[in-house]
UniProtKB/Swiss-Prot annotation:
UniProt-listed GO biological process terms: L-arginine biosynthetic process
Signal peptide interval: none
Catalytic reaction list: N-acetyl-L-glutamate 5-semialdehyde + phosphate + NADP(+) = N-acetyl-L-glutamyl 5-phosphate + NADPH + H(+)
Catalytic residues in the record: C146
Domain of life assignment: Bacteria
Organism placement in taxonomy: Bacteria, Bacillati, Actinomycetota, Actinomycetes, Frankiales
Record flagged with keyword Oxidoreductase: yes
UniProt xrefs under NCBIfam families: argC (TIGR01850)
Family: Belongs to the NAGSA dehydrogenase family. Type 1 subfamily.
Enzyme class, UniProt record, top EC level: oxidoreductase
Protein name per Swiss-Prot or TrEMBL: N-acetyl-gamma-glutamyl-phosphate reductase
Length: 342
C-alpha cells in the first residue's frame, strides 16, 4: 500500500461511504480521520458497518495541518472546506466533496451559498469531454454535486452534439434523503418522508448555478436551465429527467446514438438498451451512471433519464475516481459499476 489518505468530515454520510470504498482499495492506506463534532469517538460507533476500522478514533480537523498524507479528502459541510484546505501543504493533493471550490463566478457563489468565494478548483467529473487530463494534472479538485453529476451526464452529450437548444433546458430530479446530510431535521424524519414526495427549493436550489456552469461550457454559450428538485422517500439515489427543445433533424435514434457514442468505453456509464429505463436501485452502492434517452415528437423535446447513487457517483465514488486520476492509479481502482439488489 503505497498511498496514504486522510479524510476530514469522516463522520457524515459522504465520509462514511468514502471510508467504505477506501477500505477496498488495493493501493491505499487510511491515515487520519477527522470529524470535529465526533472527535474522540470510535469510528465504529458512528459507522458500525465498517468493522475493519475497529480501534480507530476520530480526531479534530486541526490535526490535519502539516499532514504527510498523499491526498486529503474534504467531506465537510458547504462553506467549511476552504479553511481546512488553507492549512494543508501545497504538496498535498486535495479532493473537496463540498461546494466551496466548484463555481467559477464569485457572485454566483454568493447568491447560492452566501459568504465569500474561496476560489475555483479543477472540476472533477471525469466523463466530461475535457475533464480527465485536467483532473490528472491537478493537486486541487472540486468534486461535483450529486444533482449536477446526474444532470450533466445526461445533457452534455446532447449539447456538444447540437441536438438541443441551449436556451430551453428543463430538469426535474428526485433524490433520497441522504443528500441532505446527517444532521437531524424535522422534514427528514422517517415519519415525515415515508409515503411522501415533495418538491423543495424550487427555482432557488444551490446546485442550479453549478449545472448551468457545466452545461454552458459544453454548449459553448450560456444556457438557461429550469431545475426542480424533489425529495423522495428513500435513503439514497437520484433519478434525473432532463429535457431540451430539440434542434431540427433530431429524432429518438439520434438521441440514443449520441449518448451511446459519448459513453462508449466508459467504465462507469451504462447507456441502457433501447426501451429500458434507469432505476435508482440498480446503481445502489456503485459508482455507476445508468442513462437512457429518446425524443418526444409531440413536444419536440429530447429526453434523457439518468440514475446514480448520490453517495456513490454523486459523492464518494466520484471523489475516489478523481483521486485515482490525480495519483496516477488505475481510474477504476477500488470502485465498481455493479449495484446491490434487491
Amino acid at each position: 500500500m503505497g498511498v496514504t489518505v486522510a479524510v476530514a468530515g469522516a463522520s457524515g454520510y459522504g465520509g462514511g461511504e468514502l471510508l467504505r470504498l477506501l477500505l477496498a482499495h488495493p493501493e491505499i492506506k487510511i491515515g487520519a480521520l477527522a470529524a470535529n463534532a465526533s472527535a474522540g469517538l470510535p469510528v465504529t460507533e458512528v459507522h458500525p458497518h465498517l468493522p475493519d476500522l475497529e480501534g480507530r478514533v476520530f480526531t479534530d480537523a486541526a490535526a490535519l495541518a502539516g499532514t504527510d498524507a498523499d491526498i486529503v479528502f474534504l467531506a465537510l459541510p458547504h462553506g467549511q472546506s476552504a479553511a481546512v484546505a488553507a492549512t494543508l501543504p501545497d504538496t498535498v493533493r486535495v479532493a473537496d466533496l463540498g461546494a466551496d471550490h466548484r463555481l467559477v463566478d464569485p457572485e454566483a457563489w454568493r447568491r447560492a451559498y452566501g459568504g465569500e468565494h474561496a476560489g475555483t478548483w479543477t472540476y472533477g467529473l471525469p466523463e466530461l469531454p475535457w475533464a480527465r487530463a485536467e483532473i490528472a494534472a491537478s493537486r486541487r479538485v472540486a468534486i461535483p454535486g450529486c444533482y449536477p453529476t446526474a444532470t450533466s451526464l445526461g445533457l452534455v452529450p446532447l449539447l456538444v452534439g447540437g441536438l438541443v437548444e441551449p436556451a430551453d433546458l428543463v430538469v426535474v430530479a428526485a433524490s433520497g434523503t441522504s443528500g441532505a446530510g446527517r444532521s437531524a431535521t424535522v422534514n427528514l424524519l422517517g415519519s415525515e418522508v415515508m409515503g411522501d414526495l415533495t418538491a423543495y427549493k424550487v427555482g432557488t436550489h444551490q446546485h442550479r448555478p453549478e449545472i448551468t456552469q457545466t452545461l454552458s461550457r459544453a454548449a459553448g454559450m450560456t444556457v438557461t436551465v429550469s431545475f426542480t428538485p424533489v425529495l423522495a422517500p428513500l435513503p439514497r439515489g437520484i433519478l434525473a429527467t432532463s429535457t431540451g427543445r430539440a434542434t431540427p433533424g433530431t429524432d429518438a435514434d439520434a438521441v440514443y446514438e449520441t449518448l451511446r457514442a459519448a459513453y462508449a468505453g466508459e467504465p462507469f456509464v451504462r447507456v441502457l438498451p433501447p426501451g429500458r429505463w434507469p432505476h435508482t436501485a440498480a446503481t445502489l452502492g456503485g459508482n455507476a451512471v445508468h442513462v437512457q434517452g429518446t425524443f418526444d415528437p409531440e413536444t419536440g423535446r429530447a429526453i434523457v433519464v439518468t440514475a446514480i447513487d448520490n453517495l456513490g457517483k454523486g459523492a464518494a465514488g466520484q471523489a475516489l475516481q478523481c483521486a485515482n486520476l490525480m495519483l496516477g492509479l488505475p481510474e477504476t481502482a477500488g470502485l465498481t459499476a455493479q449495484g446491490i439488489a434487491p
